[in-house]
A protein has these predicted regions:
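N-terminal nucleotide/polyanion-binding subdomain common to many enzyme families
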Residues: 1-77, 82
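S-adenosyl-L-methionine/SAH cofactor-binding core of RNA-modifying enzymes
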Residues: 61-113
Length: 113
């Protein structure tokens, strides 16, 4: 299984890759996890990924450019390592999306590609 994960906090994934069942899967080569930090795809010296909300108000948004670039890089990296003809699937977790539950994960695991 090839996984490309876009995250601002790549260091927190050491717990996933170094321990437990997922760590064993990585060590046995059953799962390959590659991390992509949107800060690596910025163009300013401060590696800025935050943007202000349009129309004012509280909160912060992510800049689209580094987010799109990191998703594209992750998708290309995963696609290169998959079987010919398989296309990398993008799963974007967002507060506006559906709640990710065990049943959804089982359904995703059953899909091809």
């Amino acid at each position: 299984m090839q996984l490309g994960i876009v995250t601002l906090f790549p260091e927190m994934f050491a717990a996933v890759t170094d321990h437990g069942i997922s760590g064993r899967a990585v060590r046995l080569g059953l799962m390959n996890l590659e991390l992509f930090n949107p800060r690596d795809y910025t163009t300013d010296k401060h590696r800025t990924v935050d943007d202000k909300p349009f129309g004012g108000g509280p909160g912060m948004l992510m800049k689209t450019e580094p987010l799109i670039a990191s998703i594209t890089a992750a998708r290309e990296a995963v696609s290169q390592k998959q079987t010919i003809g398989e296309k990398a699937r993008v799963i974007y977790l967002s507060p506006q999306g559906q709640t990710l539950k065990q049943g959804s994960i089982i359904d995703l695991a059953k899909r091809e590609g």
